[in-house]
């Protein structure tokens, strides 16, 4: 046993693909007589006919050798005999009338569909092993878990699939008493391949327990050979089933008598580690391809044909397998290819494969190198389709470094000449003289002919340009994304060429600069001369027949084209009028229509209005004793309103040229004495800290200046105030100048209408009066009024300003063209009266 255990072998794909049979033409001189050849031809014909009757796909049948055809034929007949007995179907039912045949075929079709669905829902595969360790039956789903096809394991020794350390345990589970050492029959021998006793003991059914006995149930774990993407090469499987009689085999003993049915293990093998949800969803789409060592496809299973759409002949006759890989993924796959050649496994990689309908599908792949006689023989690639979102996520995480080392010769297999045609060159090399496109095409053709057919760039050149320029994907937004990576891969290849030094005669990477026209650019660049050299291609003809222009493709690439709003309509209901009104109020509060004059220039003005000012001051002195209490409280209210509205600093960003309609509600003519006592200048004003910081300004209308007439209904008077020219005099910020500017004459003879009252307050206070209602406020501190004193410099400036009579101010045409007269001009006070009386608000028309 020890000597034979050294020659332990595992299951592998031993059969070779038979040479395709071709019918030779009959020679003209006639058929030569060769009995042995005629016998071989007749035998091959019968074997081909027998193979066509097997219940396997045609691609599996084409790969079977003669011994495999005979082996599978015997196993199929044995399985059919078992089911005939198990299902108790009589020959009369099978050979009945036409109606019975139709009903039987219908039931058979239903049963077949039900069985397929059950196998798909099962997390594992079905395995039937006889007591002599032969695989009686294995379901087709064994390929999804172990990588072996159904035809590879049927009627083969099960020990070729089992790990050497688990074979003894598996043999013990095959015995009904879990004690195979009791088999001391003369037929017992030693199997050379496994080193285990090969028992041929036949039991009488009366000597063993019945089928429904608990002693016949089995549940154990062993490791099976796995060709899929696991590092150890074995997969731990859980076997759960029972020993049952295998009917209908009709085996004969040594004396020629028919032996009774023998026991066999009917079990379901499931992976010990349960699969994830993702594996459950995608396990039915896993397909496998077989390649040569240079990645040339030589086979594909049925699921691969469904996913990719190619037939096996189309895959195997196109040459290098890199023709089916996206250009942006070629270098990435080539790196994994070299890793697999060195280590025997590529690891999990994600890339794009080209389907038959010119679509790119993302797959997760793992390649394994299989050996024969100690030498690499071929490559088995297991691939699982992915969604576009999963593939894009893997692509963003991919390392974009150069995979090859040019100094060690790893890039020798991938020639790096520049064979790109004008339409595919992502970064054309422009020459000084600017050669034409025809010369470039000729150079490209020569470079393409000089390429090694098995090189990476040769495979890229054999791809159709339309799969990158016009990808037939479900969403057009993926086109720029794919072309972007395609151009990046082209640039990487070109960088390889630029950085490569000669290494030898035949093993160097050749670099040839191809002259390209300057109007040729990449697809994503949107150059005006794009695709000029492709107008004679078949692709251009197809697009012309479909009515598609290259300009349409440019619009499809532009993502902004899909996001533009071409309605051009503005819904005024979407405009927030509240913000506009508040903005206008704030602007009106922060702008002054009157600009003061300079204090230095006021003293140099001529004294032409002394009579008017003296009369004004005389009237103020007469009324100061009667209106002292009336003035103090409104003045405090005015300061409180200014503090509440926070008008400090609101007059900085104003524009005197802005047109602002000013609404002035007409009030009943009232006379208020603003300042009755000007001797108390030394007394501290309670709101001086707030008033001094405010750049309050005000100018006055000249004595002979015409004003606007009174409104007919005495409601509101709207007139523009934005065209006043700014005064050349700087603003005053002191409290004295502020107090001085508020004094206006009340009884003046200007020849104007006495019924009209002109209102000249600041714009900010007009807004304050209209937007806030005057409520009685507590009186904090009474301010001693200042009586006019001509000796004071501030008052003297005020007197000189009005005695001159010429203020050099320009007013709108609406004010200059009115010839009304007024005997007395009443000043609308800038503060509120003592009684609680709400002021009328400005109407919305004044703002809108």
UniProtKB/Swiss-Prot annotation:
Sequence positions bearing N-acetylmethionine: 1
Record's subcellular location: Cytoplasm; Nucleus
Domain PAS residues, every copy: 111-181, 275-342
Inducing or repressing factors: Induced or repressed by TGFB1 and dioxin in a cell-type specific fashion. Repressed by cAMP, retinoic acid, and 12-O-tetradecanoyl phorbol-13 acetate (TPA).
Tissues/organs with expression: Expressed in all tissues tested including blood, brain, heart, kidney, liver, lung, pancreas and skeletal muscle. Expressed in retinal photoreceptors.
Keyword Nucleus annotated: yes
Region ranges (Required for maintaining the overall integrity of the AHR:ARNT heterodimer and its transcriptional activity): 50-82, 118-126, 266-268
Gene3D superfamilies linked: Helix-loop-helix DNA-binding domain, PAS domain
Ranges for domain PAC: 348-386
GO BP: apoptotic process; blood vessel development; cellular response to 2,3,7,8-tetrachlorodibenzodioxine; cellular response to cAMP; cellular response to forskolin; cellular response to molecule of bacterial origin; circadian regulation of gene expression; negative regulation of DNA-templated transcription
Effect in UniProt of substituting residue 50 to D: Abolishes transcription factor activity
Task performed by this protein: Ligand-activated transcription factor that enables cells to adapt to changing conditions by sensing compounds from the environment, diet, microbiome and cellular metabolism, and which plays important roles in development, immunity and cancer. Upon ligand binding, translocates into the nucleus, where it heterodimerizes with ARNT and induces transcription by binding to xenobiotic response elements (XRE). Regulates a variety of biological processes, including angiogenesis, hematopoiesis, drug and lipid metabolism, cell motility and immune modulation.
Disease: Retinitis pigmentosa 85: A form of retinitis pigmentosa, a retinal dystrophy belonging to the group of pigmentary retinopathies. Retinitis pigmentosa is characterized by retinal pigment deposits visible on fundus examination and primary loss of rod photoreceptor cells followed by secondary loss of cone photoreceptors. Patients typically have night vision blindness and loss of midperipheral visual field. As their condition progresses, they lose their far peripheral visual field and eventually central vision as well.
Name this protein carries in UniProt: Aryl hydrocarbon receptor
């Amino acid at each position: 046993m020890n000597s034979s255990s050294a020659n332990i072998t595992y299951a592998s794909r031993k059969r070779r693909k038979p040479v395709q049979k071709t019918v030779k033409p009959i020679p003209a001189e006639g058929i030569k007589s060769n009995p042995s050849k005629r016998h071989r031809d007749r035998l091959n014909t019968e074997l081909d006919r027998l193979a066509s009757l097997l219940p396997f796909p045609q691609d599996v049948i084409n790969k079977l050798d003669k011994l495999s055809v005979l082996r599978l034929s015997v196993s199929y007949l044995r399985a059919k005999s078992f089911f005939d007995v198990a299902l108790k179907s009589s020959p009369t039912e099978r050979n009945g009338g036409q109606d019975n045949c139709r009903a039987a075929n219908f039931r058979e079709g239903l049963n077949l569909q039900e069985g397929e669905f059950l196998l798909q829902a099962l997390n594992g595969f079905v395995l039937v092993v006889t007591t002599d360790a032969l695989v009686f039956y294995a379901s087709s789903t064994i390929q999804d878990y172990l990588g072996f096809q159904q035809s590879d394991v049927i009627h083969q020794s099960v020990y070729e699939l089992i790990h050497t350390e688990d074979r003894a345990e598996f043999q013990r589970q095959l015995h009904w008493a879990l004690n195979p050492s009791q088999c001391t029959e003369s037929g017992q021998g030693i199997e050379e391949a496994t080193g285990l006793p090969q028992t041929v003991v036949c039991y009488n059914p009366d000597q063993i327990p019945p089928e429904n006995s608990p002693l016949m149930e089995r549940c154990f774990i062993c490791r099976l050979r796995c060709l899929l993407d696991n590092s150890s090469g074995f997969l731990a499987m859980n076997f759960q089933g029972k020993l049952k009689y295998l009917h209908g085999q009709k085996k004969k003993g040594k004396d020629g008598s028919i032996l009774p049915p023998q026991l066999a293990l009917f079990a379901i093998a499931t992976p010990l580690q349960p699969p994830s949800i993702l594996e459950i969803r995608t396990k039915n789409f896993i397909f496998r391809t077989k390649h040569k060592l240079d990645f040339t496809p030589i086979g594909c299973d049925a699921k691969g044909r469904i996913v990719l759409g190619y037939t096996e002949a189309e895959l195997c006759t196109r040459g290098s397998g890199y023709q089916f890989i996206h250009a942006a993924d070629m270098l990435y796959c080539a790196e994994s290819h070299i890793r697999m050649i060195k280590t025997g496994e590529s690891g999990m990689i994600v890339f794009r494969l080209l389907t038959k309908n010119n679509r790119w599908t993302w797959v997760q792949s793992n390649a394994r190198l299989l050996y024969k006689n100690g030498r690499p023989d071929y490559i088995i690639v297991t691939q699982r389709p992915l969604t576009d979102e999963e593939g894009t996520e893997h692509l963003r995480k991919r390392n974009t470094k150069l995979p090859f080392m040019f100094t060690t010769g790893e890039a020798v297999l991938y020639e790096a000449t520049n064979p790109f045609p004008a339409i595919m060159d992502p970064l054309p090399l422009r020459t000084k003289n600017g050669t034409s496109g025809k010369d470039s095409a000729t150079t490209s053709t020569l470079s393409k002919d000089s390429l090694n057919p098995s090189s990476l760039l040769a495979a890229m050149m054999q791809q159709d340009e339309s799969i990158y320029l016009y990808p037939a994907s479900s969403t057009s937004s993926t086109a720029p994304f794919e072309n972007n990576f395609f151009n990046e891969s082209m640039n990487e290849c070109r960088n390889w060429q630029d950085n490569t030094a000669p290494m030898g005669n035949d093993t160097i990477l050749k670099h040839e600069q191809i002259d390209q026209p300057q109007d040729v650019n990449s697809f994503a660049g949107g150059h005006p001369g794009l695709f000029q050299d492709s107008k004679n291609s078949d692709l251009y003809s197809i697009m012309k027949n479909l009515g598609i222009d290259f300009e349409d493709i440019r619009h499809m690439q532009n993502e902004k084209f899909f996001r533009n709003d071409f309605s051009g309509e503005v819904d005024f209901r979407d405009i927030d009028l509240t913000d506009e009104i508040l903005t206008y109020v704030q602007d009106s509060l922060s702008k002054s229509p009157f600009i003061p004059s300079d204090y230095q220039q006021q003293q140099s003005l001529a004294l032409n209005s002394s009579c008017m000012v003296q009369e004004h001051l005389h009237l103020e002195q007469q009324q100061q004793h009667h209106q002292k209490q009336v003035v103090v409280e409104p003045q405090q209210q005015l300061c409180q309103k200014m503090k509440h509205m926070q008008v400090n600093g609101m007059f900085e960003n104003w524009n005197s040229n802005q047109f602002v309609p000013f609404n002035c509600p007409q009030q009943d003519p009232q006379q208020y004495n603003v300042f009755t006592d000007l001797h108390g200048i030394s007394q501290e004003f309670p709101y001086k800290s707030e008033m001094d910081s405010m750049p309050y300004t005000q100018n006055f209308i000249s004595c002979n200046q015409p004003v606007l007439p009174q409104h007919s209904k005495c409601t509101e008077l709207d007139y523009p105030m934005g065209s006043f020219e700014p005064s050349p005099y700087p603003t005053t910020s002191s409290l004295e100048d502020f107090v001085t500017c508020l004094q206006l004459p009340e009884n003046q003879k200007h020849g104007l209408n006495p019924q009209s009252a002109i209102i000249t307050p600041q714009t900010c206070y007009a807004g304050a009066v209209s937007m806030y209602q005057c409520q009685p406020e507590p009186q904090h501190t009474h301010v001693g009024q200042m009586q006019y004193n001509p000796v004071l410099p501030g008052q003297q400036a005020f007197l000189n300003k009005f005695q001159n009579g010429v203020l050099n101010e320009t007013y709108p045409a609406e004010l200059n063209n009115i010839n009304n007269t007024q005997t007395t001009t009443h000043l609308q006070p800038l503060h509120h009266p003592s009684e609680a009386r709400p002021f009328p608000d400005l109407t919305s028309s004044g703002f809108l």
